[in-house]
Amino acid sequence: MIILSIETSCDETSASVTQDGKKVISNIVFSQIKEHSLNGGVIPELASREHLKNITLVLEKSLKEANIQPQEIDLVAFTQGPGLIGSLLVGINCALVFGYIYKKPVLGVNHLLGHIYAAQIENEIEFPSLVLIISGGHTELLALENYLQIKKLGFTCDDAVGEAYDKVSRILGFGYPGGPIIDELAQKGKDIFNFVRPYLKNDNFNFSFSGLKSSIFNLVSKNNFNLQEKINICSSFQSSVIDVLVEKTKRVLKKYSFKQLIITGGVAANYSLRKRFLSEFSQLKVIIPSLKYCGDQAAMIGIAAYYQFKYQLKFNQNYHWEGKPNLSF
């Protein structure tokens, strides 16, 4: 089955052609980082306009690189949510028009399911698997019990981990996006600030990062730190975040049995985090997608769509789909 997929949930415009839930034939991603870095974060209205400007070009380039004609497509998949509603609608309408013109079935996919199935591209997912999704908008621990059977075990009560990175980077004056900036600087710093490890006193598997962010804001507001001291803050902040993610994951594994641990989402591209998880959980098969499949891109939507189309008992078979910005499991 050849699937054309479109991803526009936030600030990446992406189109991909995949085959049989495994092979990535093309995967074109147009990033808006340059546009949003000027504002220190994603501006929803600007993101929507950029998607409108680039979606046709990205779609055409994806088909051309795959050497696939529209008539050869078996299914058109798109991100239905969660995400920014304006951004979602650009991708949804593009997919619906394409499907209608070429008489192809269309299928809306949960963006988070896409992140999970990014792990399938270069590996084989086994069930049950424990999944940690860490991105700019989500921090969740999930039990993947079967292809589409997912149980939420833990979630963030406030800021997602990627959001915390962006805000701390902005507090320190290092810009956007905060994830890669702080990760790089943290490796040049010393972990000398004893920041709180939030929510570790709680017995549940949930997360909270707003308090950590606030403590850094208060610290920076009261002191005139030099560059090296700010770099040290990056190191201590990152150590705190990774400690919490590792400890919460360990708690789940003490209570439940899983065949694999899947770490996915944009923050899974973090060098220190990847290294730490591979070291801490060496007794378990740990799957972390390649860097190119950690962030938002349409290949993961196409892979997820294959299994959703194959195993979902029923779904909307017409061309009337709506965006769901708060879609969850």
Curated annotation (Swiss-Prot):
Query: Main site of residence?
Result: cytoplasm
Function recorded in the entry: Required for the formation of a threonylcarbamoyl group on adenosine at position 37 (t(6)A37) in tRNAs that read codons beginning with adenine. Is involved in the transfer of the threonylcarbamoyl moiety of threonylcarbamoyl-AMP (TC-AMP) to the N6 group of A37, together with TsaE and TsaB. TsaD likely plays a direct catalytic role in this reaction.
HAMAP family given in the database record: TsaD
A GO cellular component annotation in the UniProt record: cytoplasm
Q: Which NCBIfam families match?
A: gcp_kae1 (TIGR00329), T6A_TsaD_YgjD (TIGR03723)
Top-level enzyme category: transferase
Question: Which EC numbers does the record give?
Answer: 2.3.1.234
Residues given in the record as Fe cation binding sites: 111, 115, 296
Question: What are the alphabetically sorted keywords of the record?
Answer: Acyltransferase, Cytoplasm, Iron, Metal-binding, Transferase, tRNA processing
Which GO BP annotation is one of this protein's?
A: tRNA threonylcarbamoyladenosine modification
User: A single Gene Ontology molecular function, please?
Assistant: iron ion binding
Compartments in which it is found = Cytoplasm
**Protein name (database record):** tRNA N6-adenosine threonylcarbamoyltransferase
List of residues binding substrate:
133-137, 166, 179, 183, 270
Residue pairs linked by disulfide bridges in the UniProt entry: none
**Which Pfam families does the entry mention?**
TsaD
Keyword Transcription regulation tagged = no
The encoding gene is: tsaD
Q: Which Gene3D superfamilies match?
A: 3.30.420.40
Q: Which InterPro entries match?
A: ATPase_NBD, Gcp-like_dom, KAE1/TsaD, TsaD
- Report the cofactor remark: Binds 1 Fe(2+) ion per subunit.
The cofactors named for this UniProt entry are: Fe(2+)
Q: Which family does it belong to?
A: Belongs to the KAE1 / TsaD family.
Q: Which SUPFAM superfamilies match?
A: Actin-like ATPase domain
